Amino acid sequence: MGKDYYKILGIPSGANEDEIKKAYRKMALKYHPDKNKEPNAEEKFKEIAEAYDVLSDPKKRGLYDQYGEEGLKTGGGSSGGSSGSFHYTFHGDPHATFASFFGGSNPFDIFFASSRSARPFSGFDPDDMDVDEDDDPFGAFGRFGFNGLSRGPRRAPEPLYPRRKVQDPPVVHELRVSLEEIYHGSTKRMKITRRRLNPDGRTVRTEDKILHIVIKRGWKEGTKITFPKEGDATPDNIPADIVFVLKDKPHAHFRRDGTNVLYSALISLKEALCGCTVNIPTIDGRVIPLPCNDVIKPGTVKRLRGEGLPFPKVPTQRGDLIVEFKVRFPDRLTPQTRQILKQHLPCS
C-alpha cells in the first residue's frame, strides 16, 4: 500500500493550500534532525518533505488523489488508467525543501534573527504557531534561556526577521613585482585554494582556482587588484573578496620614486674633479653615456628625462631617470700627492 501523504501531514484529504502549508511548517519543525534526536527523525523528516512536495503542487496532488502514490510515480493507475507522460520522483533532499520553504539553509536562523534586516521572514507566520505546549517544536530550546523561547507561560509571538548574510572581510595578499614588470606590464598566475558550496546549498567542497592578475604598465606600489567573492563560501556567509596589493621588489640598481627611477652612480675623486663619462643603465636594458665635464660634488643630481617608468593613466609618457652621484675618496694620500694638491687646489 502506498504512502498516505495526508496522514503524514496530519490533515484531511480536503485540506486547502493554507492548511497544507501550516501542517508542513509544524511537522517539519517538530521532526527536523537538528532538533529531534529520535532515531527515525531523519526518515520522518524526509517523508514530511515528500508529502508537502506532492500536496502543495495542484498537478501532483490531482494525480495522487486519483491514482495514489504508485500511480503518481509510475504514470498510471493500477486499473489501467493513464495519467499521461508525467512521472513523479521526489528529489530526495528534505533539507532543500525546508530551506526553500523557510527562506534559508540554516533551519533555526529565524530564532536568532535580529532587526538588522527590514525584510520580513517569508516562511514564518506567527499566527500558524498553534501547537500545544507538550508538542511545541521549539520547546527543547527553553532550557538554554533564549529570549522569547523559554518554557513557561505563553505570550504573543513577536515578528521575526531573517539573519541577513554578511560578507566576510577581504582576504589581502601582498604581491611583489619587479620594476621591469611595472615598466613592461605583466600577467601573474596565482593559485588559491578555497571552499565552495555544493549544489545542495549546505555542504562544501575544497577546490583550487587559478587567478590571472593583469599588472598594467606604471602601476604604483599599493595598487589593489580585487577578485570579488572568490573567498571561502559557506551556507551562512557571502564569500570574501580576494585582494592583491602591489609591493615593489628591491632592485639591484634602481629605487623607485613614483614614476621616477633613482640610480646611484659612484665615481672616483679624480673623475669628480677632472670630468668623466658615466655609463647609466636603464630599466629596459639600454646603457646611456652621461658626460660629466663640470666638477661633481657628492650628492650632485642629473636627470635623464623620459627614461623612468610609464605614467599609469598615460603609459606613453614616462617619468625620469634621476642619477645621484656619490664620490669615492681615497683612504690615504702620499706626502707628494698631498703637497701637489695644496699647491693647485683653491683654498675655498
Curated annotation (Swiss-Prot):
Entry-linked InterPro entries: DnaJ_C (IPR002939), DnaJ_domain (IPR001623), DnaJ_domain_CS (IPR018253), DnaJ_subfamily_B (IPR051339), HSP40/DnaJ_pept-bd (IPR008971), J_dom_sf (IPR036869)
The UniProt entry's GO CC annotations, sorted and at most eight, read: cytosol
Q: Which Gene Ontology MF annotations are present?
A: protein-folding chaperone binding; unfolded protein binding
Q: State the species of origin.
A: Bos taurus
Show the Gene3D superfamilies listed in the entry.
Answer: DnaJ domain, Urease metallochaperone UreE, N-terminal domain
What residues does the J domain cover?
4-68
By its UniProt entry, which PANTHER family does this protein fall under? Answer: DNAJ HOMOLOG SUBFAMILY B MEMBER 5, DNAJ HOMOLOG SUBFAMILY C MEMBER
Name the chain's protein.
DnaJ homolog subfamily B member 5
Xref: SMART domains: DnaJ (SM00271)
Q: GO:BP terms for this protein? A: chaperone cofactor-dependent protein refolding
| PROSITE patterns associated with the record | DNAJ_1, DNAJ_2
Top-rank taxon of the source lineage equals: Eukaryota
User: What are the alphabetically sorted keywords of the record?
Assistant: Chaperone
Specify whether Calcium is a keyword of the entry: no
